[in-house]
Amino acid sequence: MKLWKRLLAIPIAASLVMGLLPAPALAEDTAHSHPICGEAHTDIGDHTGDNCKDATWTAWDGTSTITYDTNNTAYVYLEKDATRESRLEVKAGYTLYLCLNGQKLESSLTSSASQGMSQVINVSNGAKFILCDCKGGGTITHSSGAKGKGVRVGGSDPAAATFSMYGGTISGNHADDPRSGAGGAGVEIQNGTFKMYGGTISDNYEENAGSNYGGGGVCAHTSGTFTMYGGIISDNQSVTDAGGVTVV
């Protein structure tokens, strides 16, 4: 009987010891899947469940080259705060879905020759850019001392570019645009379309070095169009016309 009790005590003691050991760290869940408009789908304006789908998003460090699929489309989420030394280009014929994932994407470009045009993201004519933020708090901005726009949509080519904003914040951009007939420190639209469904455009400043249209938050000009279904535009400034929004 004593021998049986001793043998029984061995596995019990081992179990108690194992219970005191720290649990192994679980691998971080890198799966990132949600609708194209954010954490959960919301009908707003012309964006309905009929044209919204769940997508699987690939991690992106914010500075490396984005890989597009055979349809020239990419779904990426920002895995950490990132500082770029060049603007992110969405080229003609390509579609980029970017989830900020609560992180900050900023530009540190300070070249005096390109201050006014050193936008964080450039959406070329014929390209599509879709922005969301599943966690909230994600920002597109410039680092301290750097000047430029948040997002520029289109250009002189009449082939329209499109930008759809469902979430995220475009803030802290200080544009010193030397071109005549331009503007927009947060978002500039030229021969393009910008639809804002959510998110925030705030605290951007259009210094307006040239004779341009102003629009500290948003400027749509030269056949550019801006439709606002939701979101917030606030506390933007311009030396000349319209601190918030200019449409000409």
What do the PLM-derived regions correspond to, one by one?
Residues 1-11:
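Bacterial N-terminal signal peptides that target proteins for export
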Residues 11-19:
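Bacterial N-terminal signal peptides
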Residues 18-32:
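Sec-dependent signal peptide cleavage junction
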Residues 28-45, 136, 164-169, 195-200, ...:
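Extracellular Ser/Thr- and Pro-rich, acidic-biased low-complexity repeat/linker "stalks"
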Residues 30-87:
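Acidic Gly/Asp/Thr-rich repetitive segments characteristic of extracellular carbohydrate-active
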Residues 83-97, 107-133, 141-163, 179-181, ...:
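Extracellular beta-strand-rich solenoid/capping regions of secreted or surface-exposed proteins
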Residues 102-116, 134-148, 161-162, 166-183, ...:
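Beta-strand-rich solenoid/repeat architectures in extracellular/passenger domains
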